[in-house]
C-alpha cells in the first residue's frame, strides 16, 4: 500500500498518480478479475502502449473517446490512457440501445468509440447513422458485423510513449458523464481531475480509512461515478487492489467477497435490500467484509444489515455527477460525530461552503426548506460545465453558487443538513412543502404496491400550488382499490400525504438507468382513468 500525497495539486491528475504508484508501489496489485491481476507497474506500461495506439488513431488533447464496455479491466486501462493524451473519456450506459444510444453517441462528438464483443450488436444496429468516429472493438473484427472496426489488441501492440505529465492540469476535463435523463434529454457533465479527487480525499477515503491488506470489491456498473469514487480511483490513490466484478449477484455476493478476501465495498439501490431479504444462514457473519457503503437503507434496515453480516456501513452524504461531493457527515471533522443522525447529509467539507437558498438565490431562514447550493473555496470543485450546453450551465448557478437541484433543511441544534427531495419533484400544497420521496416511501410499504411515483399536478384553485398525484403499479393479481390505498397512507402518514389524484398503471416510464421519468407523468396529467379524492366516498382523517 502506498498513498499518494494529494496536498500538492500537481499530483491531482490520474496519470501523475499512476506514475507515482508505478514507481513506489510497482508490484502492488491494482486491478483484479477472475482471469487477471495487474500491478500498478503493469497498468502503467499497458496504458502507455494504449496511449500510443490511440494517438496513432488521431486522439489528441481536448478530444473525447466514448466507451461502451462491460465491467472489466479494459475500461480502466482505456480511461487512464485517454487521459494521458489530454483527452476525456465518456462512458456510455451499457443498457442503452436504439435511438437512445444513437443520440448519446452523436452528442458526444467523439473521435473514437470503443465497444466490446458483448455489446457490439447494439452499435451494429445504428452504425449507418453514425458520423466519422472510428470504432475500436475489443474482440475479433474479422468475425464482427461492424464496418471497418479496429482491433483493440493492435493498440496494445504499439511501443510505449513517454508522457509529459506537466502538460496535464488538475483542472482539465478528464471525463464526461451523462445525467440519467429524468427531466428530459441527458446532459454531459464535464468533470475535472480535481472534481473526482476531492470527493475521494474529503469523502470516500475518510469513510473507509484503508489500511494495508484492504481489498475493494466493486459490483457497480463502470458508467456510474460511484464505481470510480469508491472503487477504481480510490484504489489508485491509496495503492490497494480493486476487484472488478461483471455484475452484482445476490446469490454469489458473499462467496465472491470471501474468494477475493475483500474488505471494502459499495452497493447501491435495491442491492442492500436484496441481500437483507435473502434467506438467513448460520454463517452470514462469516465474511471478510469490514466496511461498505449501502445506499439507501432505512435506519431499521441499516441496524439489521450491520448486525446480521457484521459489516460497518459508511455514513451519509450528498454527491452528484456535477459535484461528486457536496457534503458528508465528517465535514471538516476528523472523526465521526455521534450527535448526528445516520440519515443526515452532514456538513460542507474543507474546500467549499453550503447554503440553502430560495428561488431567487437568497439564503432561507433557519428551519426553512431551501435548495442546497455549494460555493467552491478552491478551484475545480464542481463541474467545468455541461458539454455543448451553455444554457444549462448558466441555469445551474446562482453567481458563484452551484445549484444542486436538491431541497434540504438544516437541523437548528447541530447545523447538519438533511435531504428533503429533488426540487423538480417536491410540490407545494396548502402552504406546505411536500416531499414526493416521503410520500412514495409510505405508499410502497403496502404489500400490494409494486412501484409508485408521486408528482404534482397544477392546482386549478391556487396558481402557485400543486395537487398530489400517485401513479401506482400493483402487484400481480392485486385487487387493491384507490380507497384502500388512500386509507393506508392516511393511517401511516400525515393527512396531507393522501393524494388528490391516483391512477393504477401497468408500468412507469423509465430511463435506461431505471429512474422514473416524472416529467412524462406530469405531461400526461389526469385522464378518464384517474381517481379523484374529491369525487370519491373516502373522507380523509385529520
Regions found by a protein language model. Give the residues of each.
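Conserved AMP-binding/adenylate-forming core of the ANL superfamily
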Residues: 8-10, 19, 27-72, 76-80, ...
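Conserved pre-ATP/AMP-binding loop-to-beta segment of ANL
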Residues: 11, 71, 143, 158-178, ...
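Structural core segment of the AMP-binding/adenylate-forming
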Residues: 19, 56-57, 84-154, 280, ...
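Conserved AMP-binding A3 loop
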Residues: 39-41, 174-198
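AMP-binding/adenylate-forming catalytic core of the ANL superfamily
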Residues: 96, 113, 354, 374-379, ...
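AMP-binding/adenylate-forming catalytic domain of the ANL superfamily
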Residues: 138, 493-515, 534-542
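Conserved AMP-binding/adenylation subdomain of ANL enzymes
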Residues: 197-215, 223-263, 278
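Gly/Ser/Thr-rich phosphate-binding loop
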Residues: 237, 262-267, 276-339, 353
Amino acid at each position: 500500500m502506498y498513498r499518494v500525497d494529494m496536498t500538492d495539486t500537481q499530483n491531482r491528475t490520474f496519470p501523475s498518480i499512476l506514475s507515482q504508484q508505478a514507481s513506489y508501489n510497482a508490484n502492488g496489485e491494482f486491478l483484479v478479475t477472475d482471469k487477471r491481476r495487474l500491478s500498478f507497474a503493469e497498468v502503467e506500461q499497458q496504458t502507455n502502449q494504449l496511449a500510443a495506439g490511440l494517438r496513432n488513431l488521431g486522439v489528441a488533447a481536448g478530444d473525447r473517446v466514448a466507451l461502451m464496455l462491460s465491467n472489466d479491466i479494459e475500461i480502466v486501462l482505456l480511461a487512464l490512457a485517454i487521459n494521458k493524451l489530454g483527452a476525456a473519456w465518456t462512458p456510455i450506459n451499457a443498457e442503452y440501445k436504439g435511438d437512445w444510444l444513437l443520440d448519446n453517441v452523436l452528442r458526444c462528438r467523439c473521435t473514437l468509440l470503443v465497444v466490446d464483443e458483448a455489446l457490439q450488436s447494439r452499435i451494429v444496429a445504428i452504425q449507418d447513422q453514425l458520423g466519422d468516429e472510428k470504432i475500436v472493438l475489443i474482440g475479433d473484427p474479422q468475425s464482427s458485423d461492424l464496418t471497418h472496426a479496429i482491433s483493440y489488441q493492435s493498440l496494445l501492440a504499439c511501443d510505449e510513449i513517454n508522457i509529459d505529465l506537466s502538460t496535464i492540469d488538475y483542472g482539465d476535463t478528464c471525463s464526461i458523464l451523462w445525467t440519467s435523463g429524468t427531466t428530459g434529454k441527458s446532459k454531459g457533465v464535464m468533470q475535472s481531475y480535481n472534481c473526482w479527487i476531492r470527493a475521494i480525499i474529503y469523502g470516500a477515503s475518510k469513510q473507509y480509512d484503508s489500511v494495508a491488506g484492504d481489498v475493494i470489491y466493486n459490483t457497480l456498473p463502470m458508467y456510474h461515478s460511484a464505481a470510480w469514487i469508491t472503487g477504481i480511483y480510490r484504489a489508485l490513490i491509496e495503492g490497494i487492489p480493486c476487484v472488478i466484478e461483471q455484475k452484482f449477484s445476490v446469490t454469489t455476493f458473499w462467496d465472491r467477497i470471501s474468494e477475493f478476501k475483500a474488505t471494502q465495498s459499495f452497493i447501491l439501490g435495491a442491492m442492500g435490500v436484496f441481500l437483507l431479504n435473502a434467506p438467513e444462514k448460520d454463517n452470514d457473519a462469516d465474511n471478510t467484509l469490514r466496511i461498505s457503503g449501502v445506499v439507501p437503507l432505512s435506519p431499521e434496515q441499516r441496524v439489521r444489515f450491520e448486525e446480521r453480516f457484521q459489516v460497518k456501513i459508511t455514513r451519509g452524504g450528498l454527491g452528484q455527477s456535477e459535484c461528486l461531493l457536496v457534503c458528508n457527515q465528517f465535514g471538516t471533522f476528523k472523526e465521526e460525530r455521534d450527535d448526528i443522525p445516520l440519515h443526515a447529509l452532514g456538513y460542507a467539507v474543507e474546500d467549499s461552503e453550503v447554503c440553502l437558498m430560495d428561488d431567487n438565490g437568497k439564503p432561507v431562514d433557519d428551519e426553512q426548506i431551501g435548495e442546497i447550493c455549494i460555493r467552491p473555496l478552491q478551484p475545480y470543485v464542481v463541474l467545468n460545465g455541461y458539454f455543448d450546453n451553455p444554457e444549462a450551465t448558466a441555469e445551474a448557478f446562482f453567481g458563484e453558487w452551484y445549484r444542486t437541484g436538491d431541497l434540504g433543511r438544516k437541523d437548528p441544534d447541530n447545523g447538519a443538513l438533511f435531504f428533503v427531495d429533488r426540487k423538480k419533484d417536491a410540490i407545494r400544497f396548502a402552504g406546505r412543502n411536500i416531499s414526493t420521496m416521503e410520500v412514495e416511501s409510505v405508499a410502497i410499504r403496502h404489500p400490494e404496491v409494486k412501484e409508485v411515483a408521486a408528482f404534482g399536478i397544477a392546482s386549478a384553485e391556487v396558481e402557485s400550488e400543486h395537487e398530489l398525484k400517485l401513479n401506482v403499479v400493483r402487484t400481480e393479481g392485486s385487487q387493491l382499490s384507490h380507497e384502500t390505498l388512500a386509507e393506508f397512507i392516511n393511517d401511516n402518514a400525515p393527512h396531507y400525504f393522501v393524494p388528490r389524484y391516483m391512477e393504477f398503471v401497468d408500468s412507469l416510464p423509465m430511463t435506461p438507468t431505471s429512474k422514473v421519468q416524472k416529467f412524462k407523468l406530469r405531461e400526461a396529467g389526469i385522464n378518464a382513468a384517474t381517481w379523484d379524492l374529491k369525487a370519491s366516498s373516502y373522507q380523509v382523517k385529520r
